Amino acid sequence: MTEDNHVLVKVEDLKMHFPIYRGVIQRQVGAVRAVDGVSFEIHKGETLGLVGESGCGKSTTGRTILQLYKPTAGKIFYEDTELTTLRPEKMRQMRKNIQMIFQDPYASLNPRMTIRDIIAEPLVAFGSATGKAIDERVRDLMKLVKLDPDFMLRYPHEFSGGQRQRIGIARAMANNPTFVVCDEPISALDVSIQAQVINLFEDLQKELDLTYLFIAHDLSMVRHISDRVAVMYLGIIVELADRNEIYANP
């Protein structure tokens, strides 16, 4: 739940257009306006739910906030830092604070890496820990997401979908981020597992003081976890309100 009115993430008139090329010389003949002028704020400690039908641009919005896509136009702020103007090295350092949890737990984990190496990857990349400290941190992270640390030398194929998603969550938490984009993190899971993962997200938010952008199409789950909900349609936000208000007066 939101702690105060402190704005952690601010998005101003965000646009992400993908060019369409045709012909032998690949001339641009148009563009797909995946995100077409989106603006919103996310307060510290809050969960903002972002919902909409497939293809409406919600996942593109999340990926563009993290600069996985370079926006066509608009501004994105984390605290007082404008992400859209950061140089690559500065943006790389910023990724300690902002992380993403992907939709597909089967595709987002390298099948050739052990769970230990997968979770430790951000620690190694940023030099956050070395030697035995890495193993200790991995064990702590596995406990945090309710996985047995004794399984750290196993491979992704030895785990269920729900367990794989927990591994992805542990990896995202490795460098103690403050803002996490959750890109439909439960849509690929069995219904029986979805509630457990949602509860884990809520527990982590309370324990680690996290702020979420929670992208989903399951309205009941979004209502359960979100403080406010934004509804997206054809690249724009058509409604943004408190979760109870938006469900009472859709």
Identify the residue ranges that each predicted region occupies:
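ABC ATPase NBD coupling module
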Residues: 24-29, 70, 83-99, 117, ...
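Helix-to-loop junction immediately C-terminal to a conserved catalytic motif
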Residues: 66
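Conserved ABC transporter NBD signature motif
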Residues: 74-82
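Conserved ABC ATPase "signature" region
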Residues: 82, 132-150
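Conserved ABC ATPase signature
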Residues: 155-159, 163
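A short, proline-enriched helix->beta-strand linker immediately N-terminal to the Walker B motif
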Residues: 174-178
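P-loop NTP-binding/switch modules centered on Walker-like glycine-rich loops
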Residues: 185, 189, 193-250
